[in-house]
Curated annotation (Swiss-Prot):
This is DNA gyrase inhibitor. Keywords: Cytoplasm, Stress response. One of its GO terms (cellular component) is cytoplasm. Coiled coil: none annotated. Interacts with DNA gyrase.
């Protein structure tokens, strides 16, 4: 699939924080966010998940992710949603982007290809910034997920 390095503008999102094994908590987060999206007619565009912990080094019960929906820069979170959602900004900067298809929920394969194959060959390395997936289709309906994985990067020294 396609791999590239891009300069990205900041992106505002609304999010629900989930904690626990990713394969259990992220689908529940999508269900919650989807319900709020419909109920409150949130003017969102892209569905994404920000990852804060590495499942290879952190215990599953402590894994944190933000199930998110991109919104316009001028979007203001209504007071009735402030107990449910957090408004945040994915920072601008240099990102590696890997476009791939995930079948059989094998996200580990996609992430492994990014970190073990594409990034080492690119001349860039991951930084401590944002790391997230953007979902490009309804994988529950289609039986597979087309995704873009974004990882903040810097040039190798």
């Amino acid at each position: 699939m396609a791999f590239k390095i891009i300069e990205k503008q900041p992106q505002q999102i609304v999010s629900i924080r989930v904690v626990g094994p990713y394969h259990e908590t992220i689908p529940k987060g999508f269900d919650q966010l989807s319900s709020l999206y419909t109920q409150y007619q949130i003017p969102g565009k892209d569905w994404l998940v920000l990852y804060w912990d590495n499942p290879e080094t952190n215990p599953p019960a402590e894994l944190r992710a933000d199930v998110s929906l991109s919104v316009a820069d001028d979007y203001v979170l209504p007071p009735e949603l402030s107990d449910h959602l957090q408004l945040q900004v994915i920072p601008a900067g240099l990102y590696a982007v890997y476009h791939t298809r995930v079948s059989d929920d094998d996200y580990a394969k996609a992430w492994g290809e990014l970190y073990n194959q594409h990034l080492p060959q690119s001349g860039y390395r991951p930084t401590e910034g944002a790391c997230y997936e953007v979902y490009l289709n309804d994988g529950r309906a289609d039986g597979y997920f087309d995704i873009d994985i974004y990882q903040s990067v810097e040039k190798d020294q």
